[in-house]
Amino acid sequence: MSLRSLFVAGLATLALAVPAPQIQARQGMSSNELESGPCRDVTFIFARGSTEQGNMGLIVGPGVCSSLKKDLGSDKVACQGVGGAYTAQLAPNFLSQNTNQASINAATDMFDLANTKCPNTKIVAGGYSQGSAVIDNTIQALGSDLKAKVKGVVLFGFTRNVADKGQIPGYPKDQTKIYCAVGDMVCVNTLIITPAHLTYGADAGDAAKFLASKVQE
């Protein structure tokens, strides 16, 4: 069986293991507070994992958003998912950047919007699974001025963990926190999906506290 077949089969198997209410909840997890709302002190940009619906997904993105609002104040944080050309399809995982350029461009648009619409906002970001590669590649390519406005990044099930040596190249390591669960094969340079890859919701609160600490420095 090919690696791609294992990846697809793994996702299918895990989907069957997800309780029905959770599957139903996946249908509408979106947040567009940067695009549609007022400027806030902090802007959280998140890229979901492959096959997740909405622009925030379900596994971890919404949890980090809600925890960050709890820690800093709901009126202080704008949460924005990466949508548009980032459709979270499976195939881009097999490309050299573990995602495609269109997805990276979609995320870049959100960072650019935060910078131009809300020049005083502090930007934090996160990504899960393929979304971790989207955010990783996006931040690497940001101009120095905009990159300096990104105060913290959290990555879950980091598909480029080995390739990028546990960090985002060209971005401060102390402003990055990577979550790789024991048994998550995605973090060790494979695309084999195991149950551990679905556990990152448990890390949402810790990730939010990390991001909150960075915007308060």
From Swiss-Prot:
UniProt-annotated site: Transition state stabilizer, residues: 50, 130
Do you know which SMART domains this protein is assigned to?
Answer: Cutinase
* Disulfide feature: 39-118, 65-79, 180-187
Signal peptide span: 1-17
Q: Can you say where in the cell this protein is located?
A: Secreted
Q: Disulfide bond among the record's keywords?
A: yes
Which leading EC class covers this enzyme?
hydrolase
The family line of this record is:
Belongs to the cutinase family.
Active-site residues are 129 (nucleophile), 184, 197 (proton donor/acceptor)
Q: What is the lineage of its organism?
A: Eukaryota, Fungi, Dikarya, Ascomycota, Pezizomycotina
InterPro entries, from UniProt? AB_hydrolase_fold, Cutinase/axe, CUTINASE_1, Cutinase_monf
Question: Could you tell me the keywords of this UniProt record?
Answer: Disulfide bond, Hydrolase, Secreted, Serine esterase, Signal
* Catalytic reactions of this protein: cutin + H2O = cutin monomers
Known function: Catalyzes the hydrolysis of complex carboxylic polyesters found in the cell wall of plants. Degrades cutin, a macromolecule that forms the structure of the plant cuticle.
EC number(s)? 3.1.1.74
Q: Report whether Hydrolase shows up as a keyword of the record.
A: yes
Question: What name has this protein been given in UniProt?
Answer: Probable cutinase 3
Gene Ontology molecular functions: carboxylesterase activity; cutinase activity; lipase activity
Provide GO CC annotations from the record: extracellular region
**One Gene Ontology term from the biological process aspect of the record:** lipid catabolic process
